[in-house]
Amino acid sequence: MPVNVLIVYDPKGPAIEALAAAAGKGATATGVAEVVLRRVQEATLEDLLAADALMLGSPNWSGITGSLKLWLDETGDLWEDGSLAGKPAAAFTTGWGRHSGIEMTLLQLIHWLLACGMIVVGLPWTDRMRSSASYYGATATGGVTPEDLMQAEELGARLAKVAAKLQAP
């Protein structure tokens, strides 16, 4: 039975949409996952509860966007009752400069995941990281490059595989 990977992102800008789609493509390509892509304005708590794995994405607006922060704040009951604990999760972001706070945005997303007791899935080192992505998650700086899309696909695939391993008997 395939795992359900939920990708929730704030669609402010085409770069974040491209990374979300690439992450979904990577998860689907594993053959072990069904992917649900949701813009934050459309995502529901039911989507979150039904997910076996979660990926959050936000453009860097000096941190995550207000829209995504509001949605995360609405999940407080799930945090309190532990509904998300033990589920694997990952993060992605975009920004206009490599040193404009991208890493801090990823860490803000990861902080929420950890607070919920989720298992954070990152990216292992590759030579591509000299110009794209981060250990913390997938990134794009300025425009989206083929390397950025590849990193997002790899993160989606890693998340799906970890979720499948956790579901295995």
Name the predicted role of every residue range.
Residues 1-83, 129-131, 136, 140-169:
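N-terminal beta1-alpha1-beta2 submodule of the flavodoxin-like/Rossmannoid cofactor-binding fold
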Residues 85-88:
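Short, proline-enriched alpha-helix->beta-strand connector loops that line the catalytic pocket
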Residues 90-131:
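Short, glycine-/small-residue-rich phosphate/pyrophosphate-handling segment
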